A protein has these predicted regions:
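Internal, hydrophobic cores of structured domains that mediate oligomerization or house catalytic pockets
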Residues: 163-247
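Generic recognition of long tandem-repeat/solenoid scaffolds
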Residues: 156-168, 261, 275, 324-344
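C-terminal, charged interaction/regulatory segments at domain termini
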Residues: 5, 303, 307-367
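N-terminal low-complexity/intrinsically disordered pre-sequences and tails
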Residues: 2-192, 341-367
């Protein structure tokens, strides 16, 4: 028998209520539930749901993982420049998937910086709205973030910044960053990456931050230059559950401070339920559903953990959270929203999160 401290917040029909509770739960109950255009056309012709990747000569099946490695605490700044790490963490990013880039070369980043800058200025001169004020011009910086790649097949991360100076700024005023984005691949599917033709580079995950109009221009330039295509990358309920479990698994080495889950229930009008659990209680529940002390976490363990939380809630409120959809997960280590937004608050477990997002991007691609 152990206790779970949790806070319950719900909004329904414009009314909001908050409740705090301590509930005792028997452990055995939880345990019982325990590149050419022809290449792009050929990719688009595949059905997304099949998760088949077109490569030169054969189809590669991209399988949904049923287990993942337990998170390992690691000082990423020993591998990656701390200044570059600071650019990635403690910011909210919008996620997209990217199909393989044709003839992309990490050695040509300086040239790409000039060409993208000229493209943005050209589009602005044609009267396209940029929505970042009255700027004199744009400067683009491409750079490589060395050290995030986990395997030899992973391409190194590319970081992009767009800077601009306001029209009425003093001459010596520094340009300010108006848009940021990065393309990455962390522990990508080896079979898929190895089967790509040598002319293609796979950086399937794009994270962006800034005006949507600039995001559209950046994507447009990439599509024209590297014959690729982009799409929104939402994070479904199953992957949000994975994130919750992986973050809870970090608690023994770093205090996650809280676990907040948001469900949307299919009522009229829809009801949002915000469910905040004390981190130690969440960890004890997680520890109780773990089958053994292995280095892997299985989907069955994640399912039992979420069902355990749902059973706590149902026992007290008679509200069946499983009837709804998990929309958001938050801890002190980061947060994620089903619409495709992610915030990584700590660099300690950044590779664990990026690996999961890389998998999501590869599975989402229409190839």
């Amino acid at each position: 028998m152990f206790k779970i401290h949790f806070r319950f917040f719900f909004s329904h029909g414009g009314t909001e209520q908050v409740h705090n509770y301590i509930v005792k739960t028997p452990l055995n109950n939880v345990l019982a539930q325990r590149r050419s255009k022809s290449y792009r056309r050929s990719m688009r012709s595949c059905v997304e749901a099949t998760n088949l990747g077109y490569t030169s000569g054969h189809l590669t099946v991209l399988r949904i993982p049923r287990s993942r490695r337990t998170p390992k605490s690691r000082d990423i700044t020993k591998q990656v420049d701390p200044d570059q790490v600071a650019l990635l963490v403690r910011k909210e990013w919008e996620l997209s998937y990217v199909t393989p880039l044709y003839q992309f070369r990490h050695t040509q980043l300086k040239s790409y910086s000039k060409h993208l800058s000229a493209f943005i200025v050209s589009e602005k001169q044609q009267g396209l709205a940029i929505e970042v004020g009255q700027e004199l011009g744009f400067k683009v910086n491409f750079s490589v973030v060395l050290g995030l790649a986990e395997t030899d097949e992973d391409a190194e991360t590319v970081f992009i910044q767009i800077l601009s100076r306001q029209a009425f700024a003093a001459k010596d005023d520094a340009q300010k960053v108006v848009w940021s984005g990065w393309l990455t691949c962390v522990n990508g599917d080896l079979e898929f990456l190895r089967s790509l033709p040598s002319e293609f580079v796979s950086l399937p995950l794009l994270c962006t931050r800034g005006p949507e109009s600039l995001t559209v221009l950046v994507k447009s330039w990439f599509e024209k230059t590297f014959d690729c295509c982009f799409g929104p990358l939402g994070i479904n309920s199953a992957n949000l559950q994975w994130l919750a479990a992986l973050w809870i698994g970090c608690h023994p080495t770093i205090n996650i401070q809280y676990l907040k889950l948001v469900w949307t229930l299919p009522t009229l009008p829809p009801m949002d339920v915000k469910y905040t659990i004390h981190p130690q209680d969440a960890w004890e529940l997680w520890d109780s559903v773990r089958q053994d002390d292995t280095t892997d976490v299985s989907i069955e363990e994640v399912t039992r953990f979420i069902k355990g939380l749902q059973s706590h809630f149902f026992r007290h409120f008679r509200i069946e959270l499983s009837a709804g959809s998990l929309k958001q997960v938050s801890t002190a280590l980061g947060s994620s929203h089903h619409s495709g937004k992610i915030k990584i608050a700590s660099p300690t477990y950044i590779t664990t999160i990026l690996q999961l997002l890389t998998e999501c991007a590869l599975l989402k691609m229409p190839i």
